Amino acid sequence: MSQSISSSTKAEEVVSVDVSQAKTLLQSGHQYLDVRTQDEFRRGHCEAAKIVNIPYMLNTPQGRVKNQEFLEQVSSLLNPADDILVGCQSGARSLKATTELVAAGYKKVRNVGGGYLAWVDHSFPINTEEEEPSAN
């Protein structure tokens, strides 16, 4: 079977880092792109100075579907030359998102293997937004 050029980016071309490496990179100024749903993000996310939540998949009455505006939303907030870490709950969605970003020309993007669950397992700092008031 032949493969089209548009789908030529393979997972092997995507760089993955573990959560310990990710924590160090975040401390050195990398941006964190959390691709989980907004509800997952609000329940808890890694502590990072520069963090953005853009879901890769959306919950619908029919189940989860890919966010068709994902690349457009990312490009409105992040530059292809930025140092970006991409994470999700376990590493599956972020791997797909990272693969798509690499194919779209993002040069310094890395997948966070293990995702938020691994971050929590390592007892790294987290933030939650469930109980916080929206204004002072």
Curated annotation (Swiss-Prot):
<feature type="active site" description="Cysteine persulfide intermediate">
    <location>
        <position position="88"/>
    </location>
</feature>
<keyword id="KW-0963">Cytoplasm</keyword>
<dbReference type="Pfam" id="PF00581">
    <property type="entry name" value="Rhodanese"/>
</dbReference>
<protein>
    <recommendedName>
        <fullName>Thiosulfate sulfurtransferase 18</fullName>
        <ecNumber>2.8.1.1</ecNumber>
    </recommendedName>
</protein>
<feature type="domain" description="Rhodanese">
    <location>
        <begin position="26"/>
        <end position="128"/>
    </location>
</feature>
<dbReference type="InterPro" id="IPR036873">
    <property type="entry name" value="Rhodanese-like_dom_sf"/>
</dbReference>
<keyword id="KW-0808">Transferase</keyword>
<dbReference type="InterPro" id="IPR044684">
    <property type="entry name" value="STR17/STR18/HARC1-like"/>
</dbReference>
<dbReference type="GO" id="GO:0005737">
    <property type="term" value="C:cytoplasm"/>
</dbReference>
<comment type="function">
    <text>Catalyzes the transfer of a sulfur ion from a donor to cyanide or to other thiol compounds. Substrate preference is thiosulfate &gt; 3-mercaptopyruvate.</text>
</comment>
<dbReference type="GO" id="GO:0004792">
    <property type="term" value="F:thiosulfate-cyanide sulfurtransferase activity"/>
</dbReference>
<dbReference type="InterPro" id="IPR001763">
    <property type="entry name" value="Rhodanese-like_dom"/>
</dbReference>
